[in-house]
Amino acid sequence: MSESNELRKRQAEFTKELHGNNVTKSGFSALVSKNKSAQTEAVAKYLKHWDGKTDADAERRRLEDYNESTHSYYNVVTDFYEYGWGSSFHFSRFFKGESFSASVARHEHYLAYKAGIKENDLILDVGCGVGGPARTISRFTGCNIIGLNNNDYQIQKANYYAKRDHLDSKLSFVKGDFMKMEFDENTFDSVYAIEATCHAPTFEGVYGEIYKVLKPGGTFAVYEWVMTDKYDETNPEHRKIAYEIELGDGIPKMYSVDAARDALSKVGFEILEENDLADNDDEIPWYAPLTGEWKYVNSVADLATFFRTSRLGRAFTTSMVTVFEKLGLAPKGSVSVTNALEEAAVGLVAGGEKKLFTPMMLFVAKKPEQK
């Protein structure tokens, strides 16, 4: 058995031990149903590289362990994400009067529009999460989507939700490493990625794989997490913000916008458009749900979401998880996860306020036609 197949087998077995076969639960009900010893192991795997060190050797270890680290990260945070954010694990712009769910859907529709996705096209979703964007985009366009993910638990959930929503004839979700895609060359009409390829050890590696499986003339559209031109890695405050984002979001290294742009060009893409959608004069910033400022709430329906994601809501969640962990209802290490997510929230808001970071650097790129 190859090394990659052995890793997949081991991850699948661990996922079954940790989560069981019940994918219908979410949020706290899912958290308290975990295998306690397996959850403790999963937390340890996730946090083992996050010891406060930001030197080159620490970065190298995180980059080398990207697959296992990302798999472990989503094993421990998926339930928290669904509880706080829903099934689309990404940020979006907000317009006055627009609900949270409408904002998220519009953000996904916009990317589908930029990718030129049409009815019955075969599309690849790179880093598909639990399939929220894929379900929305398939409904919007009528396309067929294959979602690629390295986390078995999220794949199980994505396939369950697709069947629940009667979209299983249009959607499928498969296990794979986006640095070593196993699809045939020139397979997909378009490819998109939403805040996922930031988990790659290098942009060039993942973009090169996307280029390979995309048909000639096809479009790749991505919302990329990058540090902006205002970021100075030699500035301790800036590096602290980047590290908080890396720690709380399971990212081995935050790269610059230049790194993403250069990687796209180097692997052969023609960049058609680039636009930092976070660099705007919007009255409501993209990081509004994390601030705890109630002036940003647009509708009564959003009160619960904004509470869960606000500073107060996150503190409440941490307190509740602390109690659950002490009572033995939540696995040991659950509080460490909420603390890491809190660090991420602090870093994301600071990075957004100072315009050092963007979660929505839009690149639209084309694979040239064959001559």
UniProtKB/Swiss-Prot annotation:
Q: Name one Pfam family in it.
A: Sterol_MT_C
**Keyword Lipid biosynthesis carried by entry:** yes
Q: Name one GO molecular function term.
A: sterol 24-C-methyltransferase activity
E.C. no: 2.1.1.41
- Catalytic function, reaction form: zymosterol + S-adenosyl-L-methionine = fecosterol + S-adenosyl-L-homocysteine + H(+)
A Gene Ontology term for the protein's cellular component? endoplasmic reticulum
Annotated PROSITE patterns: SAM_MT_ERG6_SMT (PS51685)
Pathway, per record = Steroid metabolism; ergosterol biosynthesis; ergosterol from zymosterol: step 1/5
**Which InterPro entries does the entry link to?**
Erg6_SMT_methyltransf, Methyltransf_11, MeTrfase_SMT, SAM-dependent_MTases_sf, Sterol_MeTrfase_C
What's in the keyword line of the UniProt record? Lipid biosynthesis, Lipid metabolism, Methyltransferase, S-adenosyl-L-methionine, Steroid biosynthesis, Steroid metabolism, Sterol biosynthesis, Sterol metabolism, Transferase
GO BP, one annotated term: ergosterol biosynthetic process
The answer on whether this UniProt entry bears the keyword Signal reads: no
> Per its UniProt entry, what is the enzyme's top EC class, as one word?
transferase
Family classification: Belongs to the class I-like SAM-binding methyltransferase superfamily. Erg6/SMT family.
Q: What is this protein called?
A: Sterol 24-C-methyltransferase
Source organism per UniProt: Kluyveromyces lactis (strain ATCC 8585 / CBS 2359 / DSM 70799 / NBRC 1267 / NRRL Y-1140 / WM37) (Yeast)
